[in-house]
């Protein structure tokens, strides 16, 4: 880490009360006040859930289209042929192909942020799964990225779909906007994400579902949020 970045983080850390738990509204205000980079930083929420990802039925994974998008221009690649390939192109997909797209991926040409595939293409996609998987790009029915309706999937991706899943520690990290967004947009996006995660709560999960939560920017320390208030948001 460069000295300038380390100094900036130290300065920002001094603005945050490490043990303070912020209300949702004040937390959003606080995290926006920490914006200091020369670029428009991403606002990220981290939610630690009361699940054990080692159990298949508690592996939370899904997708949500944020009402105000993420603020990021998303490049979309689609594995499809024939009519479905035409539908994907007409919907605004940046890259559409089949064997040729797989070859591009094998050659390291991955200039896209999301991959969508029709079900009949999954055998082909599986051949590049070792490349796409670690990058979080592998299409999955749970995130709506393996589908016949490629036009809708492309539209969702372009309008701000966020794919999420718990990591090994039971934490979901997800972008919910940019530092330049007003507070209302960030709150709306966060509420939509929490609703989506709540809908996926497994019946086998015991105790409090959202154990802890925080907000941060790309270049800022984290702001602790009131998790109970977050769970009560409707």
Curated annotation (Swiss-Prot):
The keyword Glycoprotein does not apply. It holds the Pfam family Ribosomal_L1. GO terms for cellular component: cytosolic large ribosomal subunit. The keyword RNA-binding applies. HAMAP family: Ribosomal_uL1_B (MF_01318_B). Part of the 50S ribosomal subunit. Belongs to the universal ribosomal protein uL1 family. Binds directly to 23S rRNA. The L1 stalk is quite mobile in the ribosome, and is involved in E site tRNA release. Protein L1 is also a translational repressor protein, it controls the translation of the L11 operon by binding to its mRNA. This is Large ribosomal subunit protein uL1. The gene is rplA.
């Amino acid at each position: 880490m460069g000295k300038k970045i380390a100094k900036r983080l130290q300065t920002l850390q001094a603005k945050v009360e490490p043990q303070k738990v912020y209300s949702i509204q004040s937390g959003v205000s606080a995290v926006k006040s920490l914006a200091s980079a020369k670029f428009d930083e991403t606002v990220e929420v981290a939610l630690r859930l009361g699940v054990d990802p080692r159990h298949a039925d508690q592996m939370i994974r899904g997708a949500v289209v944020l009402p105000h998008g993420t603020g990021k221009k998303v490049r979309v690649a689609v594995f499809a042929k024939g009519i479905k390939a035409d539908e994907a192109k007409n919907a605004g997909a940046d890259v559409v192909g089949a064997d040729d797209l797989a070859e591009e991926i094998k050659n390291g040409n991955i200039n896209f942020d999301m991959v969508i595939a029709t079900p009949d293409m999954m055998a082909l996609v599986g051949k590049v799964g070792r490349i796409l998987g670690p990058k979080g790009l592998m299409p999955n029915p749970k995130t709506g990225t393996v589908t016949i309706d490629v036009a809708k999937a492309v539209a969702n991706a372009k309008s701000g779909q966020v794919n999420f899943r718990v990591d090994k520690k039971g934490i979901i990290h997800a972008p919910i906007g940019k530092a330049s967004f007003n507070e209302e947009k960030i709150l709306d996006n966060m509420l939509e994400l929490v609703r989506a995660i709540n809908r996926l709560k497994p019946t086998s999960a015991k105790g409090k579902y959202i154990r802890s939560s925080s907000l941060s920017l790309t270049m800022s320390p984290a702001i602790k949020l009131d998790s109970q208030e977050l769970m009560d948001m409707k």
